[in-house]
Design a protein with these regions (language model features):
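Short S/T/G/P-rich N-terminal loop/turn motif that feeds into the first structured element of a domain
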Residues: 10-11
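Cleaved targeting-peptide boundary
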Residues: 19-27
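Single-residue recognition of alpha-helix capping/boundary positions
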Residues: 5, 25-26, 49
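Bacterial N-terminal signal peptides that target proteins for export
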Residues: 1-7
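Compact alpha-helical subdomains of small soluble proteins
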Residues: 40-93
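N-terminal signal peptide c-region/cleavage motif recognized by signal peptidases
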Residues: 14-16
Length: 93
């Protein structure tokens, strides 16, 4: 197997394995915040797409700053959770 093939296999297998060791609340936050970050990175000129992005931002970003702070405090002693949570910006709203 080539190095590229091995990396692809690892990328496909690692996220479910990581999610299995994360507390459910953290895994849910990660999914929501990743959707938020996706919409934050969008740029559009089409008015319909702009409205869709704005809806996505409201649905996925609002409240995540407070949720991140709360989860970091709650799971301060959980190394895997903190490692994942520390990847996110503290203020995106």
């Amino acid at each position: 197997m080539t190095t590229r093939g091995l990396m692809l296999v690892l990328l496909l297998v690692a996220p479910p394995a990581l999610a299995a060791e994360l507390p459910h609340e953290v895994a849910e936050f990660v999914a929501r915040r990743d959707r938020c970050d996706h919409f934050r990175g969008e740029d559009a000129e089409n008015p319909a797409r702009i409205r869709e992005i704005q809806r996505g931002l409201r649905a996925n970003c609002e409240g995540t700053d407070a949720a991140l702070a709360r989860l970091k405090q709650r799971f301060a002693g959980h190394a895997a959770a903190r490692a994942v949570l520390d990847r996110y910006d503290d203020a995106v709203e």
